[in-house]
């Protein structure tokens, strides 16, 4: 397990401290709403932020399982994602690190106190993606993502907690 190497002030005063804050392994719970007050799906899993080869780079690797809450109940759906976070002088740029869009920009954020706020919208076809991070404590944060378009009204709430030495999260394909 990768743990945070440097203890920094909270909230992180700058982007270098923010990179140190994110470094390590986290577990998450996620709730997904699509156009209604009732959640359509939940997900659980783990993600790691590890140092990349470029100064100011963290690589994000997420693994988890998704459960539909209505209609398509059954076995969990396993998923994974990779992103490339670049901590620059004034913003955090997030690039795709898997799939057909490797290296292309996904989101860009500004640090405002205990929040990372979008520096710009991310347009994917007719859909607009926006997310904001709230740094809740030294060892937890939330990320709320909105996806809006002609056929989408999606809200995704991710609650992340740092994994400690006593916590070894598991992501398995067995039903809960």
Task: Put a short name on every predicted segment.
Residues 3-176:
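Soluble ligand-binding/transfer domains with enclosed cavities or grooves
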